[in-house]
């Protein structure tokens, strides 16, 4: 999913629910770096995390011991995004990615992603990965626009 997202012209929003886990293998850490995320997810130790990357570069990243909420805009204000992360240390694990008033994050344990197509300037997919286990189980990919197909 993320490997394919890396091959296109996408903006990726990430929010952590609970813990990213220290089981994140090198190949996945490397892929996240290639996508533009600068934070080493293994070192979060249950902290909250919000990140936005576009074109292989970090646009916004924030970590904290408290629940985080950020209101950001994409595409020159065309899309309003509210991102919430509750790491394990907050006692309130949650991941929310709301674009123009609609919830897109699967709110699964681990790292939640929402992918926006930069050409269409619309959300195209969302998925969460439970990185606290080696199988990296994911909640099914939600694709929002049929003309854009991101498959595993």
Describe each region flagged by the PLM.
Residues 1-152:
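Short acidic-hydrophobic catalytic motif
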């Amino acid at each position: 999913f993320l490997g394919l997202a890396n091959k296109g012209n996408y903006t990726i929003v990430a929010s952590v629910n609970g813990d990213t886990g220290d089981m994140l293998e090198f190949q996945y850490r490397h892929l996240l770096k290639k996508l533009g995320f600068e934070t080493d997810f293994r070192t979060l130790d249950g902290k909250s995390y919000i990140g936005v990357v576009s074109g292989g570069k970090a646009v916004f990243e924030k970590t904290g011991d408290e629940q985080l909420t950020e209101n950001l805009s994409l595409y020159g204000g065309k899309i309003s995004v509210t991102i919430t992360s509750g790491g394990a240390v907050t006692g309130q694990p949650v991941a929310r990615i709301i674009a123009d008033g609609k919830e897109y994050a699967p709110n699964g344990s681990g790292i939640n992603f929402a992918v926006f197509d930069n050409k269409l300037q619309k959300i195209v997919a969302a998925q969460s990965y439970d990185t606290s286990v080696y199988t990296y189980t994911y909640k099914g990919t939600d694709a929002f626009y049929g003309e854009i197909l991101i498959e595993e």
